[in-house]
Amino acid sequence: MRRQLEDNPLYGGIVNKTKLASILTLAVLILAVMAFAQTDPGVQSGSRGTGAALPSVSADSPSGMAAFFNDGFARFQEVESVSGGANNGLGPRFNSNTCSSCHAQPAVGGSGPAVNPQFQFTSNGVAPGNTMPSFITANGPTVEVRFPFFFNRNGTVNMNAPNGGVEDLFTVTGRSDAGTCNSATTLPQPGFAAAQSAKNIIFRIPTPTFGAGLIENLDDSTLLVNQGKNLNNNFGISGSFNHNGNDGTISRFGWKAQNKSLHVFSGEAYNVEMGISNLLFTQDRPLPGEDQMGTGLPASCLNLGGKGYPEDSSNPSGSPQAAVLDDVSAFSNFMRSLAPPSPGGVVFNGQQVSAQTISTGGALFSSIGCATCHNPTPGMTQASNFTSSLSSAPVPAYSDIEIHHMGNGLADNVSQGGAGGDQFRTAPLWGLGQRIFLLHDGRTTNLMTAIKAHASRGSEASTVQSNFSNLSSTQQQEILDFLRSL
């Protein structure tokens, strides 16, 4: 570059070394400013109210709603065993052994932590007879795995046979409390390496549950009114709702809004992620392939805890009142009682971002179309018999609760309820400032990368993403700062 500058007639022939150094310094500074101007401020510190109970729950008597919250909080962190002790029933297949190992950032009930607890399971006694899948890393996201399609007997992918069920990472093989189910031959892990090679594998990360009770208590009619208001938007966005198959009501939890309620969300997770049968999912769950072939789980791996089925149920003779509940009810009450995250300041490169910058970023976020899906406040809750903080309360979730086509770039080719292979629920953005892993599969920790991923063939968000790309670097940074303030 120096020789080019010295010989370039635009610089008057030979340029002296001092002038050349100045030019190079200026170029470096310009590049540094350009890089700085579009940088994710990163995960923000502090709690921002996450992990706390709703005000009316905290203010209740120790024997009232506060007791249910505290009981659920404790059970959410219980470590499950296969057999023996009060908290048995784990497995025979599982992804983790406690709710809080997946829902931990920045507090119990949140999203996946910075250090992945799954990575230690083969060495710390949780899953000693297992092989650690290559995609599980120490500082990567906590995940569940699905194969979008079934495999043929010859090992090829059958594109005409949709699968999409969870393939649990670990088995109880090798554990001292696994009883008769203690052979890798009897209970092998899924073929993760083959699925990776065939590109027939997708990942999901945990969704945070802060403020979930408010989302649950949004009336269907409120959501439908919001949808109607957006029918004539200028951004090519046309979302829909996933519905509960039994009563046709709007479902709203999970990456594809596949779960109607927090109770169903809890029951499914207990069964799928930890292998614990309950009043909603009453049997130990085989892998999708075992279910398809009709083989089911080996008899030697059934009822390992000795409780019979379901393994989790109510205890009418329990005392105090909260202890009467089954774990699934305790989990759902805990999540229903969690306060939503509060917006906060943003620190970037050691400097406090101004409130004006954050406000400007919020206005830009709306003007370019982001708020069409990420609705700042989709409505007020209806009356609640659970606790007064859930009644007539605003829900600043930054979501319309609708499912949208996100294109082939984000598609996971898994259908759940009315949500197709490239459809996902608009992820609520409250608490984004403290979220580490982004998008449904945790593929990135960088907001810029996540925003760019919204544009691909078939995505409803492509126009909005293009609007973002057309902003100046300063304006893009203002939006990033705003997002990390949530």
Label each region the model flagged.
Residues 2-3:
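Basic polycationic patches enriched in arginine
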Residues 23-33:
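Bacterial N-terminal signal peptides
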Residues 11-12, 483:
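Short hotspots in intrinsically disordered terminal tails
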Residues 12-13, 409:
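Residue-identity detector for glycine
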Residues 6, 13-24:
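Bacterial N-terminal signal peptides that target proteins for export
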Residues 35-486:
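Periplasmic c-type cytochrome electron-transfer domains
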